[in-house]
Every structure is written in structure tokens, then in C-alpha cells.
Amino acid sequence: MENIIEIKNLSFKYNTTKAIFSDLNLTIKKGEITTLLGKNGCGKSTLIKLLSKNITNYTGNIFLENKELKSYSLKELATKLSIVYQNNITPQEITVFDMVSFARLPYQNIFFYKQTKEDIEKINFALKETDLIDYKNTIVSELSGGQLQRVYIAMCLAQDTEIIILDEPTTFLDIKYQKSIMKLVKRLNQELHLTIIMVLHDINQAITYSDNIVALLDGEIIKNDKAHTLLDEELLNKIYDTEIKIENNKVISW
């Protein structure tokens, strides 16, 4: 499997703070689900900001499809990579269809927006893939939390990017909707061959739905391997700095 993202010797720090990353090296495989794990402050959110060009004052290199990330315009990057953030500002009095339509903006003339036949086809495809086609005319404020998360994922599909980043996609959802969202993510990865990068706190979800795990501790990668290899109490205790118990291939307490 070829690499779609390569990070080489990357270093970064926020103003006067100590370095978040020092000579970080990481590769993300094309067409796989890679999950970033670690306790708060380990660098997960910063890594997402780096990949999305929200942070650019780093040293080292980030390559996306063998091209230096800094050389991408934001509009060009938006055709390659889409993100569902943990805390999104959601317009309330707008239909699901119209909200998903916003995802087509990277393909439009900045001075003149006109929805094309291709735009409508991409939007409807995204709604069907996320089981929202029957809700296309529903006002967003009427949706449940799980349905709203599907809308954000539909926006990524309509944006037509090969890479999707999901920052805590199951946060604030009940167990039923958590499972539903994770199954959707896995299906989209398998059927559409998308490269998906997730940030998760739930270790069992990470093991169940990921191909690869990248575990961070104080800005360093201490594990970058197949998901099942995370079932190691000593390793998990180190990652989270707390006692974690595993039973029958599941984390039962932490």
C-alpha cells in the first residue's frame, strides 16, 4: 500500500511553549483507516492543524501525494482533504441538502457561484451513502446528534476528497449512534477506498474499526502499527499514564 501522507523531521512549538513535536516522522497509508490515540495534550489536535494548513510555521516537511503541503493553495487542498471537526458551528435554519451543498464551494468560481449538474449529483450521492436522502429537505435544527454527524460526513463525500479527517466523530453521541457512525466510516472506507484519519479516545472503537494505530505521548510516536497490536496493558498504561485492564481482547477498565 502506497503512502498518501509523509511527514519528515517535523518540529513545531507554540510561541513560548516547549516543542510539541521534535523531528516527527510519520507515514499514512492510502486507502486505510489510521487512528491517532493518546491522552489530552499529546499532539493529536496539533497534528490535524498541521495537516489542514491551519498551522504552517513548522520546520521539516509534510508531503501530500508526494507534493509539499505548503505548496498547495487552500482551495486546492480542499479538493484533496476534508475534515469533520469535534466542535462545529452548525447553521440552524437551513436544509440538509443546502448544508451539504456548501462542500462544493472548492470547485466553484470564487466570484460567481452556480450549482452545476455535477454538483447536484455529488450531493445526492453523498446523501445516499450516508442514509440521508430522505432527509434532504429537513431543517438541520430538527436532526438528532447522530444524524447531524452524518451530515458532516456527507459534506466530506460531496467535497469529493480522497482523505477524510474525523476529529472525535462519536463525541456527545449515545452508544447506539456511536456504533452507527463507526460502521458508516468503516463502510465508506471499504466501498469507496477512502483514506480516513481519526482521532478517538475510545480504545475499543479504535481497535475495532481501524487498520492502523498511531499512539502519541508528549509529541512522540510510541506506537505505529496494526490496530490489534494495541491490546497490550503495559503499552496502554504508558500511553494514558493510568492503569488499564484488558479482558477477552477488550479494554474493560481505565
Predicted regions and their residues:
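Conserved ABC transporter NBD signature motif
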Residues: G60-E68, L77
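Catalytic Walker B motif of ABC-type/P-loop ATPase nucleotide-binding domains
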Residues: I164-E168
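Helix-to-loop junction immediately C-terminal to a conserved catalytic motif
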Residues: S52
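The feature captures the beta-strand-to-loop junction immediately N-terminal to the Walker
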Residues: L37-K39
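Conserved ABC ATPase signature
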Residues: I139-L143
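A short, flexible loop at the N-terminus of ABC-type nucleotide-binding domains that lies
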Residues: M1-I7, S11-D23, S71-S73, P91
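ABC ATPase nucleotide-binding domains
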Residues: I239-W254
